């Protein structure tokens, strides 16, 4: 077992497998703590097949009654902005609510307790501030003025370049595991520690690990062209928004790419290497039905772009950060569950402290429970931007 008391570790070599947001930030933090680090990915950082391969991701402090993730979100956002301030687009996030006992109300209480900015807006105020929005069916909304969107693919690529500039080694290679042996492109890995951070490829890579319960459902993201001559759906004019109970979310047009939205419920289970990444007519029409009700000026706009990616869902939507149960000095990091991207820097910082045995540093970021452990989990969709609804609420 690798246990090192010193805070700088030039003698330690760590191999991180997977250059998505968790793996790249873990590699960067290991390097910043002095380790020699090799970051391996079969397609390379920022590739379009990764769960972090789309253009943007929501960053928000609201996580219902949970107060650990809000702290991680703020801690991570500071690091994203330090890496490159243009990675954060401060749109604010608007949470639509139709009841007083839901995710939004729990989030408001938590944000108040943590001293994080939030506003309660009634339906009339929503329509006054953003006339593009029809609050039909909503009685109020929670608004996070300090939240917004992160540039996803560009963020991972930028973090990987920073890691390389800091002396890290980035390699393209196919990792495989056979018992206790790890190979990359056929060559055996020799390292003091290995971190498996392969996102939706974890079930393929480590399928024999007990309690590694990660499903890989398809997720479709639709970009609608904004109306000609109308900038009301651009970032700065309308916030990022979430309908938790309705299982929809959206991000305003950034870089003129279109008004992004997604029916946020799991699609079919897919192989991330083999799935055909084409939008389905069904989900596009579901999305149009939602637009017709709540963003009527967008309802008949054409699809400008589409992304088909995948989630890596754990049953309870909490991440997995734990030791490999049988492989010495190996760690499993994954299960982003549709809300992991924003937390990438905090995950990397926390994992690097665990791997290098810096218990004091790890304790400052540790959750108050065993949520990240390899363990049986009870099904819940709680931490994603989708509630319990199995399909979207749409009145076409």
Q: Which residue ranges define each predicted feature?
A:
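Helical element adjacent to the flavin cofactor pocket in flavoenzyme catalytic cores
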Residues: 145-179, 192
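Short beta-strand to alpha-helix junction loop
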Residues: 96-103, 143-161, 278-282
